Amino acid sequence: MALKEILPGKLGFGAAPLGNMFRDIPEAEALATVEAAWNDGIRYYDNAPFYGAGLAEIRMGEALADKPRGEYVISTKVGRVILDEIEDVSARDLGEKGDVFKYGRPNRVVNDYSEDATLRSIEDSLKRLKTDHIEIAWVHDVAQDFYGDEWLGVFESARKGAFKALDRLRDEGVIKAWGLGVNRVEPIELLLALEGRRPDGFLLAGRYTLLDHDRALQRVMPAVAERGLGIVVGGPYSSGALVGGPNFEYAPATPAILDKVARIKAIADRHGISMKAAGLQFSLANPAVAAVIPGASRPGRIAEDRAALQERVPSGFWRELREAGLVNPAAPLPIAD
């Protein structure tokens, strides 16, 4: 089923911060953040076992437990199984993400993309989320940022296991859609080229943003649109770099990135618009994009995101960005006049 037929709106909720991403978030604050999203009208919630070793799913399950299940959509991910066994969180190999979830639960996280592990992962997620079904399952992180030069072997394991299992679950009506949830474009290119596998869309984090969109624009968006699929854009603020944060790609931003942010912000300031509005509205301007899911760890962030989505951005801003070479000339822009 096409993602745009499943997703209830352009703005969703990315739950990674609820897994104590970068900081130890008090339980009450985490639950209040989900409640703020619900009160704002957000009805699409994305999660993953990997986020805090199940913590984000547990918190979301608690926060949504009293909400009518037919009124919202959940996506979660497969590829990691969370065990009862406790491990040293500091010793986890998280690839480029380093110690992103060092404040999460200490349960052992096992990377496993087999068919059996996929089914177990979904079953475990349902328990943590306190629900009897999910709408969308993403195969998580089969890419270079986690597996380096071994990523193609991991992808092959997922092809034989997770892809097969999710194809069957969708055909049986257990889930409505599946695809990849990744931070790199290449795995999506590879899956689109495979015979016999029919993903419904993709969650692409950090690769269709104002700061980084060239490869996705050229290699993924046209194929996705042509096939009637859809993209959910995660990380629209590029790990916070676009809105003044110190990080890009989960690491300190390089001078080149900081310079690009400063140049975009100078233009935004001249036009009196927020960087959040620029980021969200750029991502959504591409017709292949079904939704954006900025993460939030504080209730106030929800209202900021909604305001950014509704903010009027003058066409002159987008034209100036293009003239300055700060966006790809082929990128669709929300120019109204």
Where are these regions (language model features)?
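Short, acidic/polar
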Residues: D24-A37, S114-R128, R184-L192
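Beta/alpha (TIM)-barrel catalytic core signal, keyed to glycine-rich beta->alpha loops juxtaposed to Asp/Glu
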Residues: E29, V142-D337
